Amino acid sequence: MEPAQQPPPQPAPQGPAPPSVSPAGTPAAPPAPPAGHQVVHVRGDSETDLEALFNAVMNPKTANVPQTVPMRLRKLPDSFFKPPEPKSHSRQASTDAGTAGALTPQHVRAHSSPASLQLGAVSPGTLTASGVVSGPAAAPAAQHLRQSSFEIPDDVPLPAGWEMAKTSSGQRYFLNHNDQTTTWQDPRKAMLSQLNVPAPASPAVPQTLMNSASGPLPDGWEQAMTQDGEVYYINHKNKTTSWLDPRLDPRFAMNQRITQSAPVKQPPPLAPQSPQGGVLGGGSSNQQQQIQLQQLQMEKERLRLKQQELFRQAIRNINPSTANAPKCQELALRSQLPTLEQDGGTPNAVSSPGMSQELRTMTTNSSDPFLNSGTYHSRDESTDSGLSMSSYSIPRTPDDFLNSVDEMDTGDTISQSTLPSQQSRFPDYLEALPGTNVDLGTLEGDAMNIEGEELMPSLQEALSSEILDVESVLAATKLDKESFLTWL
């Protein structure tokens, strides 16, 4: 017999191996992927599964919800199914109103007016149930109806016909053999509350009698009561009413303390006088004040006249040949500016009434009143920026080109020696005047009015070609340390 021929070996499949089938016919779990590889599962029924989830939520009746175990069949303790017993009788649930069944809470209407608060609140007193403070002399005050929040001890005797017993859990209850009932409420609390009930109150007494320590009302005040029993006060002096007790006013209390502590001094008897003398004597204080006021006004007038005299002397010292009438008036107006501020804008005899309003306006603006304002003086535009004698301009002409003032041809012969002499004629106090800046150039004669057209030819003759050549000046080669130009 020939040996059986072996079948040729099958080549290894190139694709993934099919899942093995178990003997039961169910596919086995796929093998684990090798390390570093991920397996992505693609399911075609994902949309169907999502719809099923939404349907289970939207339509719970039609959804196949698995049956849960009933609560009774679960292993829960017995206390889970028993409701808690009422704890109104226990210490944890005790309230202040333990005798709610016997006595209902009674709230007394409190007075909304401040008049119910008497001065007895400051002094030792007690607080009644109605909220009114009464003094020591008042009737016995009623205590609060609040009950104790703790259990009454067992040694306190019970009322007749009552008996206390305890349940199996140790809770106390009470037996009433009179009517054969049981209750959780302690009858001893009702007894204590009945003892605290005040006696029937007497008819309403006016609060003035109730609090005798408050003292009498101030002069001109009266106490009254409305139909509801609320107290108010009438002030006959100014014919007003108020809820507030005037005796509670701190000003009245202070005055009352002062009058009580300080001894009362009788006024000295007045000497017999005639009817006219009596009227004058009554207003002596007013007369003294008027006399002092008149003295102050007279002193102020004397100072004003003295100041005017000083200014007139200063005007007389000015040379009449160089100071004409309009400029004297200008100086007088300048000198009167401080006086106008002190006197409230009253013009002096030197100035006219028509000028006072404009001077007052210019003074309040805190500027020079003679700069481009009014018809009294107008400063012309200056073209000699470096040669003006005004204190408002800054000379910028180099000193090298103005060696001496004599070289300028101004057309008018001006002596250099006359300028210092004229400046020396002005008093020094003119420079110290507040709010003014006396321009000496405006106070000189007409000879000092140097026109710019006459000054320009002399400047053009003195200027060199280098200073007029801007390009050569701005060149870097022309600038050195010895240059007369200073760049800022």
Swiss-Prot record:
GO biological process assignments: blastocyst development; bud elongation involved in lung branching; canonical Wnt signaling pathway; cardiac muscle tissue regeneration; cell morphogenesis; cell population proliferation; cellular response to gamma radiation; cellular response to retinoic acid
A GO molecular-function descriptor: RNA polymerase II cis-regulatory region sequence-specific DNA binding
Annotated Polar residues bias: 348-376, 384-393
Coiled coil: 71-85, 283-344
Stretches with biased composition (Pro residues): 1-21
Region (Transactivation domain): 276-488
Compartment annotation: Cytoplasm; Nucleus; Cell junction, Tight junction; Cell membrane
Pfam families to which the protein is assigned, alphabetical: TEADIR3, WW
Renumbered residue ranges of the record's region Disordered: 1-47, 76-99, 261-293, 339-393
Ranges for domain WW: 156-189, 215-248
Superkingdom of the source species: Eukaryota
Record PTM Phosphoserine, positions in chain: 46, 90, 94, 112-113, 116, 123, 149, 274, 352, 356, 366-367, 373, 382, 385, 388
Keyword vocabulary terms for this entry: Activator, Cell junction, Cell membrane, Coiled coil, Cytoplasm, Membrane, Nucleus, Phosphoprotein, Proto-oncogene, Repeat, Repressor, Tight junction, Transcription, Transcription regulation, Ubl conjugation
Chief place of localization: cytoplasm
Expression (tissue specificity): Isoforms lacking the transactivation domain seen in striatal neurons (at protein level). Ubiquitous. Isoform 2 is expressed at higher levels in the neural tissues. In the embryo, it is expressed in brain, eye, and the maxillary and frontonasal components of the primary palate.
Modified residues (Phosphothreonine): T48, T95, T104, T397
Modified residues (N6-lactoyllysine): K75
PTM characteristics: Phosphorylated by LATS1 and LATS2; leading to cytoplasmic translocation and inactivation. Phosphorylated by ABL1; leading to YAP1 stabilization, enhanced interaction with TP73 and recruitment onto proapoptotic genes; in response to DNA damage. Phosphorylation at Ser-385 and Ser-388 by CK1 is triggered by previous phosphorylation at Ser-382 by LATS proteins and leads to YAP1 ubiquitination by SCF(beta-TRCP) E3 ubiquitin ligase and subsequent degradation. Lactylation by AARS1 promotes nuclear localization and stabilization of YAP1, leading to increased Hippo signaling pathway. Delactylated by SIRT1.
Record note on quaternary structure: Part of a complex when phosphorylated that contains DSG3, PKP1, YAP1 and YWHAG; the complex is required for localization of DSG3 and YAP1 to the cell membrane in keratinocytes. Binds to the SH3 domain of the YES kinase. Binds to WBP1 and WBP2. Binds, in vitro, through the WW1 domain, to neural isoforms of ENAH that contain the PPSY motif. The phosphorylated form interacts with YWHAB. Interacts (via WW domains) with LATS1 (via PPxY motif 2). Interacts with LATS2. Interacts (via WW domain 1) with isoform JM-A of ERBB4 (via PPxY motif 2). Interacts with TEAD1, TEAD2 and TEAD3.
Entry remark concerning the domains of this protein: The first coiled-coil region mediates most of the interaction with TEAD transcription factors.
Protein purpose: Transcriptional regulator with dual roles as a coactivator and corepressor. Critical downstream regulatory target in the Hippo signaling pathway, crucial for organ size control and tumor suppression by restricting proliferation and promoting apoptosis. The Hippo signaling pathway core involves a kinase cascade featuring STK3/MST2 and STK4/MST1, along with its regulatory partner SAV1, which phosphorylates and activates LATS1/2 in complex with their regulatory protein, MOB1. This activation leads to the phosphorylation and inactivation of the YAP1 oncoprotein and WWTR1/TAZ.
Family indicated by similarity: Belongs to the YAP1 family.
Protein name per its UniProtKB record: Transcriptional coactivator YAP1
Source organism of this protein record: Mus musculus
Gene: Yap1
